[in-house]
Amino acid sequence: MKVVILNDEGHQEVMVEDQVKLDEIKEKNKDKWFFISDTGQKVAMNEVSLEHGIRELQIIEPLIGG
């Protein structure tokens, strides 16, 4: 699975091959949203799993205010 992290510094791509690496990313980004880029669907951090067969995830910085 490719994980794309979008933030103030631009974007960073990380290849995630196992659940341990995915869990690290989830822990670091637990206050953010994931988007499944294939579908544009927004998912909560705790719903993301390698078992879903997702090809690419984008991590989006949370919007402040509203």
Segment roles from a protein language model:
Residues 1-64:
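Ubiquitin-like/PB1-type beta-grasp interaction modules and other compact soluble beta-rich domains
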